[in-house]
Amino acid sequence: MTSPENVRRVACVGAGVIGGGWVAHFLARGYEVTAWDPAPDAEPRLRRLVEAAWPTLTRLGLAEGASTDRLTVTDTLEQAVADAEFVQESAPEKLDLKRDLLARLDAATPPGVVIASSTSGYPMTDMQTTAADPSRLVVGHPFNPPYLIPLVEVVGGERTAAAAVAWASRFYEVAGKSVITMDNEVPGFIANRLQEALWREALHMVASGEATVRDIDLSITEGPGLRWAVMGPMLTFALAGGEGGMAHMLDHFGPSLKSPWTRLAAPELDKELYDAVVAGCDEAADGRSIADLVAERDRGVVEVLRATGRLGPEEDSR
């Protein structure tokens, strides 16, 4: 098995928004990337995505030798993984599809090469059931877009080797990611669980007429989101306790956890709520296209990363 520090060739299977984002990230880090997707328009769509992401990646800092010319789109899955030293799967979130695809990847990928799934919620235990060698299958869950958001959550399944989890975690670190290595499988992992709680509350407030989509977005971007970008919710709450820290925070505000504020059960996504949320987002876009909004988001995240000192000097171990 190639060491994480010496990987040169990465295969990306699935080239949609997430898979394409991975392709862009790995290219920017100087890897040779082979990609495969069964969609007939996969290659031009993927190359457009990479081209659109490249200015942002350039601002973030490219590794030595990084080039979009290092991308090869293959005709078959088998061609994509034939010489791969790491495989990132990013197929649609359908359990049977993931299960079958991981089994195919396991059969086609050279022995010992770690295969990671970008699944946003399925436990690897449920996906590795038909693979001949489930020991090398791990979850490597990114955040959209993978070329911009540093976080990756890594966790294995019941039949995954601990060495594969450790290898994947180290590889992602070498590839410029911020890694959480989870000891236990949790449906939805960590960050999505937290996002989901906020999302449910937001939908309830829109459904009940308590807040508009604009109100909800502003409440985060102009409020706690600014603090969370620096140190996260837990440490932010600790600061709210003053010199007493989190202990004082819990003593003072802990009882309010039992207040009937939250409605953590999912709301009924009826037509009225659906239309209200869609209309609110259209209003917030104010005529800007999705491409315009993506570019605006990317510029903003780069500036947040720069302002919080997370861009650092360019590093390249390849």
Swiss-Prot record:
Signal peptide: none
Coiled coil stretches, renumbered: none
Gene Ontology terms: biological process: carnitine metabolic process; catabolic process; fatty acid metabolic process
Pathway: Amine and polyamine metabolism; carnitine metabolism
Catalytic activity as recorded in UniProt: carnitine + NAD(+) = 3-dehydrocarnitine + NADH + H(+)
Origin: domain of life: Bacteria
Locations listed in the record: Cytoplasm
Cellular compartments per GO CC: cytoplasm
GO function terms (MF aspect): carnitine 3-dehydrogenase activity; NAD+ binding; oxidoreductase activity
Root EC class: oxidoreductase
Family annotation (Gene3D superfamilies): N-(1-d-carboxylethyl)-l-norvaline Dehydrogenase, domain 2, NAD(P)-binding Rossmann-like Domain
Keywords tagged on the record: Cytoplasm, NAD, Oxidoreductase
Record-listed E.C. numbers: 1.1.1.108
Ligand binding (NAD(+)): G14, A15, G16, V17, I18, G19
One Pfam family recorded for the sequence: 3HCDH
Function of the molecule: Catalyzes the NAD(+)-dependent oxidation of L-carnitine to 3-dehydrocarnitine.
Family as reported in the entry's similarity comment: Belongs to the 3-hydroxyacyl-CoA dehydrogenase family. L-carnitine dehydrogenase subfamily.
Subunit structure: Homodimer.
PANTHER family: 3-HYDROXYACYL-COA DEHYDROGENASE FAMILY PROTEIN (PTHR48075), 3-HYDROXYBUTYRYL-COA DEHYDROGENASE (PTHR48075:SF5)
Identification of the protein by name: L-carnitine dehydrogenase
Source organism (scientific name): Streptomyces coelicolor (strain ATCC BAA-471 / A3(2) / M145)
